From Swiss-Prot:
It is found in: Cytoplasm. ATP binds at L326, G327, K328, G329, S330, F331, G332, K333, V334, K349. Activated by phosphatidylserine. It catalyses: L-seryl-[protein] + ATP = O-phospho-L-seryl-[protein] + ADP + H(+); L-threonyl-[protein] + ATP = O-phospho-L-threonyl-[protein] + ADP + H(+). InterPro entries: AGC-kinase_C, C1-like_sf, C2_dom, C2_domain_sf, DAG/PE-bd, Kinase-like_dom_sf, PE/DAG-bd, Pkinase_C. This is Calcium-dependent protein kinase C.
Length: 649
């Protein structure tokens, strides 16, 4: 073929911006589009944003340099690990919804897109192959980031506010006038207000200012709050983002680096570090989880038969001064007691043998003792000091948990903010995970049985309803539990396993978030009908992450219920509701609780119901004739002293 000279137009290579193997090009969007990094709308005319030519990720021009994951088109790191796969399923949306990857509308009437069962991510079917495998992690920065240093030295908190990047535009010119407020929360009006200078017309302000906040011992349960605000000359200043750190956490370890700015509710309880390379972060988390699983195997060995006490360790009722009734019920009563000759305080649960025999509860009592005596328990289960018996009674000597229970707190506050509920739910979950690994179904999880210690950490109490040896597919059929928390399979007399605990966990979580039970009825029959047949309605104030978690836990079919699958623990920890939760630190009690109970003195019982504490700790008489004819062998092996018990004075 003869070659000829022809006219051709000139070429110019487009300006490609490479970030973490993404190849971003400026682009004009013909339809409304949202940024996948900050979740804000992409405004303007012309080429308003950037789109990756490999994976189609869409971001603002100002956001592209902060994308923290490797482009899936070039992905060879931990983002490719199957353990971080999204669980996408076809979904029909009832209201306009935008793709969390490319930012454009999920169009159509039915099955418009895919929704992840675990993290609630919404994407187009065409985008699924390009989505990074980061299920359970949050790679977005909705309000920008701030660089700070914080430490406690003596009685002073030292804070350095250095700079911020990629803040939200707040003014008509697309910029903002940011400044930072520094304070302790809960806020004391008598303390000095501290704030930085205002940087005019900037989304990337540099302050480089230092502050000192005086603290006393009473401030250790408070949090250092940093809030970024936009200054306005004519109207109220606008909130831009915040974060906070527990003073007790800063005392243990200073903080330094970039942190995400959060909304007001989250910022009151969290300080989330920015991970510029989320790939490395995931690798580090996985190695920690691997080490944690190895250590947990050592920490939680198979339960063995407990050793009975030696003669020199014998504990008697005469060793204690009984002070105040803390609670009572059909089982007997719980009394605050002081060990004679010491400052040691204990909560002693006293049960009548005649009532136990008549109610056929001997085995339940022995199970409760064996569960309390399990070795190497996590710190979120009540500790047992010892068990002993007299001719007519059984005594459980346990640690005194003096912060009251969650029922008392809910009655005081009405309901909890979501970060508070997430903290309590995470600590409760650690306790349930342990019990389930031991083959124990708890069966009586409720607000009344979740106590708060002096620091504000939770303690699960009352193991009288537990069922042992429920491993794998093994089930039981006993009808038991507290009516409001009973799972549908118990109501329907179906065989069940640990699934009933996750149902009760869902009910408890709903009560913490909504301040009311999810099911109700005039009587038990109506209540049980509601549990088996009715759907739960959720307050509009709840976030979609909270609703998604509650729906997963309150699924009526046990096999489909969250937490009941082969990877139940991972499924719960990976939920979007728990994204800010650092599980490893939660397990080690390193996270400062959101609330510290008010305790006036060692023997203070003001956090317990006055109906009980006003009662004298008298021992009520038993049926002497019945006791004389009682076979005491029924309770052989009950007496026990815990060699692992740690005395706290």
């Amino acid at each position: 073929m003869e070659k000829r000279v022809a006219r051709r137009g000139a070429l110019r290579q487009k300006n490609v911006h490479e970030v973490k193997n993404h190849k971003f090009l400026a682009r004009f969007f013909k339809q409304p589009t949202f940024c996948s990094h900050c979740k804000d709308f992409i405004w303007g005319f012309g080429k308003q944003g950037f789109q990756c030519q490999v994976c189609s990720l869409v971001v603002h021009k100002r956001c592209h340099e902060f994308v923290c994951f490797i482009c899936p088109g070039a992905d060879k790191g931990p983002d490719s690990d199957a353990t971080n796969l999204h669980k996408f399923k076809l979904h029909s949306y009832g209201s306009p919804t935008f793709c969390d990857h490319c930012g454009s509308l999920l169009y159509g009437l039915l099955h418009q897109g895919l929704k992840c069962d675990s993290c609630d991510m919404n994407v187009h079917k065409r985008c699924e192959k390009n989505v990074p495998l980061l299920c359970g992690t949050d790679h977005t920065e909705r309000r920008g980031r701030i660089l700070i240093k914080g430490a406690v030295k003596g009685s002073k908190v030292l804070v350095e506010i250095l700079e911020a990047k990629n803040l939200c535009p707040m003014d008509p010119n697309g910029l903002a006038d940011p400044y930072v407020k520094v304070k302790l929360i809960p806020y004391d009006a008598h303390k000095l207000k501290l704030k930085t200078k205002t940087i005019k017309a900037s989304l990337n302000p540099v302050w480089n200012e230092s502050f000192t906040v005086d603290i006393g011992p009473e401030d250790n349960s408070k949090r250092l709050s940093l809030e970024v605000w936009d200054w306005d000359r004519t109207s109220r200043n606008d909130f831009m983002g915040s974060l906070s750190f527990g003073i007790s956490e800063l005392i243990k370890s200073p903080v330094e680096g970039w942190f995400k700015l959060l909304n007001q509710e989250e910022g009151e309880f969290y300080g989330v570090p920015v991970t510029d390379d989320i790939t490395e972060s995931i690798q580090e988390i996985k190695s920690k989880m691997h080490r944690s699983s190895i250590s947990s195997e050592k920490r939680y060995p198979e339960p063995d038969k407990v050793q009975n006490m030696s003669k020199q360790d014998i504990v008697r009722a005469s060793d204690f001064n009984f002070l105040t009734v803390l609670g009572k019920g059909s089982f007997g009563k719980v009394v605050l007691a002081e060990r004679k000759g010491t400052d040691e305080l204990y909560a002693i649960k006293i049960l009548k043998k005649d009532v136990i025999i008549q109610d056929d509860d001997v085995e339940c009592t022995m199970i409760e003792k064996r569960v309390l005596a399990l070795p190497d328990k996590p710190p979120f289960l009540v500790q047992l000091h010892s068990c002993f018996q007299t001719m007519d009674r059984l005594y459980f000597v346990m640690e005194y948990v003096n912060g009251g229970d969650l029922m008392y707190r809910i009655q005081q506050e009405g309901k909890f903010k979501e970060p508070v509920a997430a903290f309590y739910a995470a600590e409760i979950a650690i306790g349930l995970f342990y019990l389930h690994t031991q083959g124990i179904v708890y069966r009586d999880l409720k607000l009344d049985n979740v106590m708060l210690d002096a620091e504000g950490h939770i303690k699960i109490a009352d193991f009288g309803m537990c069922k042992e040896n429920i491993m794998g597919d093994k089930t039981t059929r006993t009808f038991c539990g507290t009516p409001d928390y009973i799972a549908p399979e118990i109501v329907l007399y179906q065989p069940y396993g640990r699934s009933v605990d996750w149902w009760a966990y869902g009910v408890l979580l709903y009560e913490m978030l909504a301040g009311q039970p999810p099911f109700d009825g005039e009587d038990e029959e109506e209540l049980f009908t509601s549990i088996t047949d009715h759907n739960v309605s959720y307050p509009k104030a709840l976030s979609r992450e909270a609703v998604s978690l509650c729906k997963g836990l309150l699924t009526k079919t046990p096999a489909k219920r969250l937490g009941c699958g082969p990877n139940g623990e991972r499924d719960i920890k990976d939920r979007a509701f728990f994204r800010p939760i650092q599980w490893e630190r939660i397990e080690l009690r390193e996270v400062q609780p959101p609330y510290k109970p008010r305790i006036k003195s060692r023997k203070d019982v003001s956090n317990f119901d006055r109906e009980f504490t006003s009662e004298a700790p008298n021992v009520t008489p038993t049926d002497k004739l019945f006791i004389m004819n009682l076979d005491q062998c029924e309770f052989s092996g009950f007496s026990y002293v815990n060699p692992e018990f740690v005395v706290t004075v």
